[in-house]
Amino acid sequence: MKIITYNVNGLRAAVSKGLPEWLVQENPDILCLQETKLQPDQYPAEVFEALGYRAYLYSAQKKGYSGVAILTKQEPDHVEYGMGIEAYDNEGRFIRADFGDLSVVSVYHPSGTSGDERQAFKMVWLEDFQKYVTELRKTRPNLILCGDYNICHEPIDIHDPCLLYTSPSPRD
């Protein structure tokens, strides 16, 4: 089974920049997307259905913000939207699809780079996410976590390495 994760930074823009052609070339069984930045009624279903993919989207309440998706060639047995924590679920950050005893997650972690408040939100999120995954693994041990973790441990992890030590978390 081939699984790919991809932060598209806007799904509609990614489609116009060649995502469907790339998808044909790579041919994953499952594609986990982050930062879809669209509402369900904006999803270009015909593009992906023509390639044999079913889509499961979880959008943020705020339009044009965040959002995750799982595109799959095989219909999942179950899809879980969110972690059951309203503050996070309102931002469309977590979706899980179960295929038999295998679970695949697409997650978009908060970045925390826009200021102290969002950095604090991110730190609480990371703690809650860890607790959630620990509990989930008790019933779904075959768990694949895909996503954008918004963690820049090394210069290679950021698009502009000069920014690595200017955002809140690396400075602390």
Q: Where does each model-flagged region fall?
A:
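A long, amphipathic alpha-helix that forms part
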Residues: Q119-R140
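Surface-exposed, charge/polar-rich loops and edge strands
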Residues: I158-L163
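Active-site beta-strand/loop signature of hydrolases that rely on acidic residues for catalysis
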Residues: N7, L23-D41, V104, V133-P155
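Active-site-proximal beta-strand elements of phosphoester/diester hydrolases
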Residues: M1-N9, D101-T113, C146
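Conserved small/polar residues in nucleotide/adenosyl-binding loops
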Residues: Y165-D172
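Surface-exposed cleft-lining segments at the edges of enzyme active sites
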Residues: I85, P110-L126, L164
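Internal alpha/beta domain cores that form substrate/cofactor-binding pockets in large enzymes
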Residues: K2-R12, W22, E26, P40-Y56
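Structured beta-strand-rich core segments of catalytic domains in phosphoester-bond hydrolases
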Residues: T36-Q39, P44-G112
